[in-house]
Curated annotation (Swiss-Prot):
Pfam families xref list: SUFBD_core, SufBD_N
Main location, first listed in the record: plastid
Protein source organism: Arabidopsis thaliana
Keywords: Chloroplast, Plastid, Transit peptide
NCBIfam families in the record: sufD
Lineage, highest ranks first: Eukaryota, Viridiplantae, Streptophyta, Embryophyta, Tracheophyta
Known partners and oligomeric status: Interacts with NAP7.
A GO biological-process term: iron-sulfur cluster assembly
Key word Transit peptide present: yes
Transit peptide residues according to the UniProt entry: 1-36
Annotated localization: Plastid, Chloroplast
UniProt protein name: Protein ABCI7, chloroplastic
Entry GO CC: chloroplast; chloroplast stroma; plastid
Superkingdom: Eukaryota
């Protein structure tokens, strides 16, 4: 039989106080990894990886101060963090041995991959092609972006924006070990900036490719660390699309991206995320979002790739009347693990969050993982937070592990969560067959419709069609 685990916790803690905290900027002096390791705990494997990351950037041109600040703080965190195991609660159901047992090689130089660039599908949107963490192609038409909008490398920022962007770089709460690996290994920083009151009509399209692949027999695993920062000033609006694709369907590589987002007062960001990595790869992504008062952040995600795929989403509401919406769909069609770990922190009155997560496991050795945390702190009165996860297990021994966690400290709230796990309904299949439709066609139609609820939430038709066709091709 298919296996399913649901671990739920609803906690009411009326006497605890939790006020929003601002993290202060800290400047550090760059020192070698080996020197820093003497004064802190270090897992030997992590230390070796940290040294490889440092060596990979040693030949690069001198970095900007904010990027160097990220590298220094990430090195400190990395050297005090052991490699995660199944004994660690955040990785209880997620096995990272695919990476741990490999010979990891950070990609240190930018290679112009003509095969990828020559075979790009056309898009109407302003876009960047990022290969192995390096920006390889940037396409911006003369009238594509309104005045004041910036899209490009940090090193190309105009002087009047440099100080503004630098206020936020390296000033996010720390993530886990993989976040620190990105911080040490990111070769550059991509920046998207939207000025006050500016509404960008068309989305900005970030297309990530893995051009360098390793060898499963020798266990050589190239790793890339793309990093993007987005700042939407007060009253601004924009959409961004992230698409991750492997050069080879069976490519053996590891993509380890980080996206950091600041949405200022009354600003809006629509975030579309399409993960189509190779079935032999590892993909571990962090998305950090900070929302100010009256702002809106919406994520729509479809993930199907990677032998190991994980998305860590951390959203913090830093003002009242704030809306967060996460709509995600994971589909396992091979021997793979797809994992969503989300955390939404509501700290102010009249905040709202809506979360829908769907997953399909269509392989007997496939596994889906969902760990969804929503924390409603004491000052977040009149909050409305809802969370729902639905899963389809289509093969014997297919597995899903669900852990909804709703923590409520405020006492004037409207909050709910639910989970449902099943196979396809027999009466639905019978309905199709009674109308002359064969069983296999009926199953494919029902499976496709299960994910379409999420796919239809993509705000742009081009992305909807691409996601729909991709999912159909996997069925």
């Amino acid at each position: 039989m298919a296996a399913a685990t649901v671990l739920g916790r609803l906690s009411l803690i009326p006497n605890l106080s939790s006020k929003p905290k601002l993290k202060s900027n800290r400047r550090t002096t760059s020192t070698s990894v080996s020197v820093r390791a003497q004064a802190s705990f270090s897992d030997p494997f992590v230390l070796q990886l940290a040294e490889s990351l440092e060596d990979s950037l040693s030949a690069s041109p001198s970095s900007s101060l904010p990027l160097q600040r990220i590298r220094d703080s990430s090195a400190e965190t990395l050297l005090s963090t052991p490699w995660p195991s199944r004994k660690d609660e955040p990785f209880r159901f997620t096995d990272t041995s695919l990476i741990r047992s490999s010979q990891i090689e950070p990609i240190s130089t930018q290679q112009r991959n003509s095969e990828i660039l020559d075979n790009l599908t056309e898009t109407q949107f302003t876009n960047a092609v990022i290969i192995d963490g390096f920006v390889s192609n940037l396409t911006i038409g003369p009238s594509d972006l309104p005045d004041g909008v910036y899209f490009g490398k940090y090193s190309g920022l105009p002087d009047e924006l440099t100080n503004r962007i630098s206020e936020f770089i390296g000033n996010f709460d720390s993530g886990d070990l993989f976040w620190s690996i990105n911080g040490m290994g990111a070769p550059d920083l991509m920046v998207i900036y939207v000025p006050e009151g500016c509404k960008v009509e068309n989305p900005i399209y970030l297309r990530y490719f893995s051009g360098e692949t390793g060898d499963r027999e020798s266990k050589r695993l190239p790793v890339s660390n793309p990093r993007v920062f987005v700042l939407v000033e007060e009253g601004g609006e924009i959409g961004i699309v992230e698409e991750f694709v492997g050069k080879d369907e069976e490519g053996f590589y590891w993509t380890n991206p980080v996206l950091e987002v600041v949405v200022q007062k009354n600003a809006k960001l629509k975030h579309s995320y399409l993960q189509k990595e190779s079935m032999a790869s590892a993909h571990i992504k962090w998305t950090f979002v900070r929302q100010e008062a009256e702002s809106e952040y919406e994520l729509v995600e479809v993930s199907t790739g990677g032998k190991l795929g994980r998305h860590n989403v951390h959203v913090q509401q830093l003002g009242p009347d704030t809306l967060t919406e996460l709509t995600t769909f994971h589909m396992c069609v091979n021997e793979q693990t797809l994992d969503l770990h989300s955390k939404i922190i509501l700290d102010h009155p009249r905040g709202a969050s809506r979360q829908l997560h769907k997953c399909i496991v269509a392989h007997s050795s496939g596994q889906a993982v969902f760990d969804g945390n929503v924390r409603v702190n004491r000052f977040a009165q009149q909050t409305n937070a809802g969370q729902l996860t639905r899963s389809l297990l289509l093969k014997p021994r297919a597995t899903v592990n669900i852990k909804p966690n709703l923590q409520i400290i405020a006492d004037d709230v409207k909050c709910s969560h639910g989970a449902a796990i099943s196979d396809l309904e027999e009466d639905q299949l019978f309905y199709f067959q009674a109308r002359g439709i064969d069983l296999e066609t009926a199953r494919r139609a029902l499976i496709s419709s299960f994910g379409s609820e999420v796919i239809e939430k993509f705000p742009n038709r081009e992305i909807r069609d691409q996601a729909r066709n991709h999912v159909k091709g996997l069925l």
